[in-house]
Amino acid sequence: MFVPRGFSYAGVHCRIKRKRKDLGIIFSEVPCTAAGVFTTNVVKAAPVIYDMEILGKNPSGIRAITVNSGVANACTGEQGMINARRMAEKTAKELNIPVESVLVSSTGVIGVQLPMEKVESGIEEAVKNLSKDPVPFAEAIMTTDTKIKIHSKKVTIEGKEITVLGIAKGSGMIHPNMATMLSFITTDANVSEDALKKLLKISVDDSYNMIDVDGDTSTNDMVIILANGLAGNAPIQEETDGFWKLYEAVHEVNQVLAEKIVEDGEGATKVIEVEVRNAPDRNSARLIARAIVSSNLVKTAIYGEDANWGRVIAAAGYSGAQFDPDRLDLFFESAAGRIKVAENGQGVDFDEDTAKKILSEKKVKIILDMKQGKELARAWGCDLTEKYVEINGRYRT
């Protein structure tokens, strides 16, 4: 694991949750250029509203992010906004930095007020425990996650070594367009505000916005990137070679984290990748891939190892994309092999036992060849199991 210069991390148990860590802080020695992408849900949690306001005013002066898990601080009215601000104010006081340099985030049960005495005590403890180890922070932001999600990447730009580190949480309520997931990316790159915003948006569109666990979109989701410039490179501007090199590093981090979220889907036993090939345009390819990976009927078919290919074609049909259904070829693929199940929009004879063997693997790929263009899109998801119902039926207990 590589850690970018100038960043430190902490995670503590402040008793919002009964046992596990539940409050984390990321801190930069110097002000950072920052950018964020937030939930598309009309119902936005207090921390989302607060952070959007702060980033609008101070996108080049962020020093810290404080995150709690266990309580979402969503649907909490004016008191929720007061509590979000109190989180920032307490963090600023303990770190001796301006309050407008602090972002906040929450994840957990909706409609419950934050226990602010516990939160403020946790902030004090977390500041004392800041270190170069990001693992405690990764543990502190988990809710129904079963494992931490961290990935890092090094890249050399104009002779300067730059590090990108991402930490995410998410396993349920994951649906295309940012849903119940938090991701915090830190880098020591020196990058302009406009370039940072652009590369984050492009990357999120092809990573977190192309995954699905259960079709729900959360009130709290956000991806935040902080760049403190301590790598010492010349400021990276839009559309330069340096921009695309940094983008590739950031996108690898986001893509790996997105796949880790899918792999940790609540109750999941299989990861599903959908690849739409030779589509008439990129938007159609994305719409179709997302519709297929989000289909509960497709998810349950994969769980049951049932090559029910009609569900895939049906999902493509209601995606909103316009295409000729009589030209579609469909394949299932895994480490056990590959099988064609439809050609030119109609079923073909195939061996059911072979298909079941292919679908029995932990990673299954659905390939839809549209034969109507050259565009490609991929989306990722997981199967839907009885365990998912069990986990979410007992979420508050």
Curated annotation (Swiss-Prot):
Keywords from the UniProt entry: Acyltransferase, Amino-acid biosynthesis, Arginine biosynthesis, Autocatalytic cleavage, Cytoplasm, Multifunctional enzyme, Transferase
GO CC terms: cytoplasm
UniProt site (Cleavage): A179, T180
Residues the record marks as site: Involved in the stabilization of negative charge on the oxyanion by the formation of the oxyanion hole: T107, G108
Pfam entry (one): ArgJ
Main location per the UniProt record: cytoplasm
Pathway: Amino-acid biosynthesis; L-arginine biosynthesis; L-ornithine and N-acetyl-L-glutamate from L-glutamate and N(2)-acetyl-L-ornithine (cyclic): step 1/1; Amino-acid biosynthesis; L-arginine biosynthesis; N(2)-acetyl-L-ornithine from L-glutamate: step 1/4
Temperature dependence: Optimum temperature is 90 degrees Celsius (OATase activity).
Reaction equation(s) it catalyzes: N(2)-acetyl-L-ornithine + L-glutamate = N-acetyl-L-glutamate + L-ornithine; L-glutamate + acetyl-CoA = N-acetyl-L-glutamate + CoA + H(+)
Noted pH dependence of activity: Optimum pH is 8 for OATase activity and 7.5-8 for AGSase activity.
InterPro entries assigned to the protein according to its UniProt record, in alphabetical order: Arg_biosynth_ArgJ (IPR002813), ArgJ-like_dom_sf (IPR016117), ArgJ_beta_C (IPR042195)
Quaternary structure annotation from Swiss-Prot or TrEMBL: Heterotetramer of two alpha and two beta chains.
UniProt similarity note: Belongs to the ArgJ family.
Function: Catalyzes two activities which are involved in the cyclic version of arginine biosynthesis: the synthesis of N-acetylglutamate from glutamate and acetyl-CoA as the acetyl donor, and of ornithine by transacetylation between N(2)-acetylornithine and glutamate.
The protein, known as: Arginine biosynthesis bifunctional protein ArgJ
